[in-house]
């Protein structure tokens, strides 16, 4: 509209777009407002058509125009043969009626029409403003909802990405742990196989050593049996300590008689030297060791010269007790004198 003004009164202003939001109280009256807007729009369209066609007419003019049009139709029906003449007459009548309406129209009718049109347009403008405010509210709500939806969607995407990353990280960690456990298991299995082989080898060696020991034990027992059978002692009754003392005295007496006999033989033969075997058999010892076995039943003594032994021993018939005698050296000089025993 250029000025939206009809008769010099205040102009009709349409609603302008504003960034302010209205209250949501009008949401419940959307249906009523929509029906009112449609009615007002229809009325406004009718008024605009009238203004574009013939201009605005009063109700009286509309009543005059309607019977004239009906009379014209009736005259056309009656006089079919004189259509051309009647048309000319009707055009002349229309021109006359228009002139009469223009001359006899009162200013009150025009003011009423203007007021009616202004009211209709004003109501139309108000309804349009309400519709614009509702549209703004709905757009703002739509914008908020879309932003919330985008935020929720972006948050879900971020959470999904984080969960995927966590899953991949845990999967990689589990794979590494599984591989390390497999390596440890393989190493331990290899160690077990190696130790099994070593244990088998050691068992074989132990079995071989046990066989060798058994063979040597059999040979040693056979040697011991042969040696014990060769050195069997004559059986005798067990002796008391007093008998052992008497036996020791007897042996000492026997030794003394032997010494005296040796001295007498030296005097008669002018030189008799008794030397006992020493040094050739043992490297450290120059004396002979006498082992005298005593048997009270036999009543005699048996002397054995053993160069390998160092101590003089007296054994009974059963070999249970052994009497150790001191080492004795006996020798005589050329002139027959006896030296002390050292």
From Swiss-Prot:
Task: Name the residue ranges with Polar residues bias.
Answer: 15-25
Q: What happens when the gene is disrupted?
A: Leads to a defect in donor preference during mating-type switching. Does not affect FKH1's overlapping role with FKH2 of regulation of the expression of the CLB2 cluster of genes during the G2/M phase of the mitotic cell cycle.
In residue numbers, the region (Disordered) covers 1-36, 57-76, 299-322
Any one GO CC term of this protein is: nucleus
Q: Origin, by domain of life?
A: Eukaryota
Q: Name one GO biological process term.
A: donor selection
For bias type Basic and acidic residues, the affected ranges are 308-319
Quaternary organization: Interacts with FKH1.
Question: What's the miscellaneous note?
Answer: Present with 2120 molecules/cell in log phase SD medium.
- Summary of the function given for this chain in its UniProt record: In concert with FKH1, plays a role in directionality of mating type switching by controlling which donor mating-type locus is inserted into MAT locus during mating type switching.
**Designated name of the protein:** Protein FDO1
Naturally occurring in which organism (per UniProt): Saccharomyces cerevisiae (strain ATCC 204508 / S288c)
